[in-house]
Amino acid sequence: ERNSPVVLIVEDDNDMRSLLCDELWGEGYQLREAKDGDEALQAVLQSIPDLILTDLKMPAGGFDYITRLKTFAPNCPIVLMTAFGGAKTKADALRWGASAYFDKPVRIGDLKEAVRKLLANKLVKEG
């Protein structure tokens, strides 16, 4: 029996973080939480998750934070969410190493589908 994938949810808004946890818990993932970029980096240094779902605009966030995540966890897919998006932000996000990008308010169904696909692809690559 394979262990269920570990998803790190990084979001400074408590209500949004709770909602994301509730939705992804229902998918059977093991969840870890962080409320800002620093907490997220510490969590990744302790143990690399299978996927990181993160806000962009939060304390210790931004594209330099995404770059640091990719340095510590180069093979970990990163799903980025932001309320301050647009075409340029999306292009930047993908260039800086995000695997998927969502504008807020996020459509939960689309988000769960992206998480499912990225985790499936990662399992295939890792064999």
Provide a role label for each language-model segment.
Residues 52, 78, 101-102:
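Two-component signal transduction core modules
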Residues 64, 85-102, 113:
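Alpha4 helix (beta4-alpha4-beta5 surface) of REC/receiver domains from two-component response regulators
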